[in-house]
Design a protein with these regions (language model features):
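Hydrophobic hinge/microswitch elements
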Residues: 17-74
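C-terminal effector-binding regulatory domain of bacterial HTH transcription factors
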Residues: 62-71, 80-122
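Short Pro/Gly-enriched coil loops immediately N-terminal to beta-strands
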Residues: 1-7, 78-86
Length: 122
């Protein structure tokens, strides 16, 4: 999907103070594409739930999109990229807990799995 595919469509969005929302809005502004903002929420999972209920289209991060995909929520590849980062914060003055290393390994494996799922999108 290109930005122009969202023109005039009802759009479900993250709240205006969300950093990912700002990146999305910036892309639409640069392209001069106007969406019809229908509703805003603080959670990407809530955005997906609202789209499932037919309230409009949305752009959300790939982690949430893949987790929410169902027969009522169709994922489509964007013709452009909006970077999304996941960051692990570790203590500066002490070693991390022993559980951190396996958690980071699991996060890395899940990221690779999500990337593979996204490659198969139309």
């Amino acid at each position: 999907l290109g930005l122009e595919d969202f023109a005039g469509q009802p759009f479900v969005s993250l709240s205006v103070d969300d950093p990912y929302r700002r990146l999305i809005d910036e892309r639409f502004a640069q392209a001069g594409v106007a969406r019809t903002l229908r509703v805003e929420t603080h959670s990407a999972a809530a955005v997906c739930a609202m789209v499932q209920q037919g309230l409009g289209l949305a752009i959300v991060n790939p982690v949430t999109a893949v987790a929410a995909a169902s027969d009522r929520l169709v994922l489509r590849r964007l013709a452009f990229s909006i970077p999304f980062s996941v960051t692990a914060l570790l203590p500066l003055y002490r070693p991390p807990l022993p559980e951190v290393a396996p958690m980071l390994e699991a996060l890395g494996a899940e990221t690779a799995h999500i990337a593979e799922q996204l490659k198969r999108l139309a």
